[in-house]
Amino acid sequence: MKLYPWLIKPYNNIVQQYQKKKAHHAILIKTPRGIGVSLLIWFISKWLLCLKPIGLNSCDKCHGCKLMSANNHPDWHNFTPEKNNLFSIESVRIINEKIFTCSRQGGSKIIFLSDTGKLTESAINAFLKTLEEPPRKTWFFLVNYKNLNSHSTLNSRCLIYKLFIPEEKKSLYWLKKETVKKNRSCLTALRINQGSPLYAKKFINSNLWIDRINFYECLHDSFKKNNLLKILPLITEKDSQVKIDWICFLLFDSIKFYFNENDNLTNSDQIELIQFFSYNYKNTILDTSIRTWLHCKYRLSNISGINCELLLSEQLLIWEKILNFS
């Protein structure tokens, strides 16, 4: 298991603080999803629990390293949300049990809380007391994916460390090596997944990627035949909201193409289809189309029990009218 290249610098920065004996006992990492924060914390924890670290690296040979590699270290506590997808006050009670007992291996104890956004209000209040005066050689790693929803008092108890989406050029280089796909395909997968290299890799290797290519081919064909209802079976079959996003991305790209923003296209592997929309429809029509599709997506996700096929049939007929199909 290797650390992703964009995480090497954050890893070195954090481990150096432990080397200098200046590390805070609780680190709250604010990060977008899909860049591997859990792996970063695992590698830092492995270094902390290593019996014979070599500089910034763990030795990979000692008993501590072997236990970590087997995901079986008794002093490494990875807490995930309970059945209701929340951390309750019971979770905090269990954390307290772990940290106020002696280390099983005689070294550090590590608590990893995978998503602070899942903490209930009562759990946060209880956890604040735990963070205030933890036992010696107890380290906390917390992850927050929603910057704005972050609890201010919890922030004040921790050292905040921010991670960002890697530079597109670096992500693209990594993705091409990992997937052996063409440059345009990798770039498209990255941009559809908001720059996340891990989500892009998963997407480009999945059936959903093939579904996307087939969907666009069917969409192009339906325009040639002046019958948008041809795509109804594909759009209702599964992942309807994802396919609405694909339509909107494509229409946005067509507007970008009109303004010569070719370097910023999301679907750089669908130039022919983008040109078709850009050459044949005014931007006002494309904009109206996007708005109606977004409204359709809103109804689909917010009205319980709605007839999906009926709603999408209606939307396709509305779209034909907007596009002035004869």
From Swiss-Prot:
GO MF annotations, alphabetized: DNA binding; DNA-directed DNA polymerase activity
**What assembly does the database describe for this protein?**
DNA polymerase III contains a core (composed of alpha, epsilon and theta chains) that associates with a tau subunit. This core dimerizes to form the POLIII' complex. PolIII' associates with the gamma complex (composed of gamma, delta, delta', psi and chi chains) and with the beta chain to form the complete DNA polymerase III complex.
Q: Name one Pfam family in it.
A: HolB_lid
Organism listed in the record? Buchnera aphidicola subsp. Acyrthosiphon pisum (strain APS)
Q: Is the keyword Transferase in the record?
A: yes
Cellular component annotations (GO), alphabetically ordered: DNA polymerase III complex
Q: What keywords are annotated for this sequence in UniProt?
A: DNA replication, DNA-directed DNA polymerase, Nucleotidyltransferase, Transferase
Reply yes or no: does the keyword Nucleotidyltransferase apply: yes
Which InterPro entries does the UniProt record give? DNA_pol3_clamp-load_cplx_C (IPR008921), DNA_pol_III_delta_C (IPR015199), DNA_Rep/Repair_Clamp_Loader (IPR050238), HolB_lid-gammaproteobact (IPR048731), P-loop_NTPase (IPR027417)
What EC number(s) does its UniProt record assign?
A: 2.7.7.7
In terms of Gene3D superfamilies, this protein maps to: 1.20.272.10, P-loop containing nucleotide triphosphate hydrolases (3.40.50.300)
Q: What class of enzyme is it?
A: transferase
Name any Gene Ontology BP term.
DNA-templated DNA replication
Q: List the disulfide bonds.
A: none
State the reactions this protein catalyses.
Answer: DNA(n) + a 2'-deoxyribonucleoside 5'-triphosphate = DNA(n+1) + diphosphate
Q: What protein am I looking at?
A: DNA polymerase III subunit delta'
Role, per record: DNA polymerase III is a complex, multichain enzyme responsible for most of the replicative synthesis in bacteria. This DNA polymerase also exhibits 3' to 5' exonuclease activity.
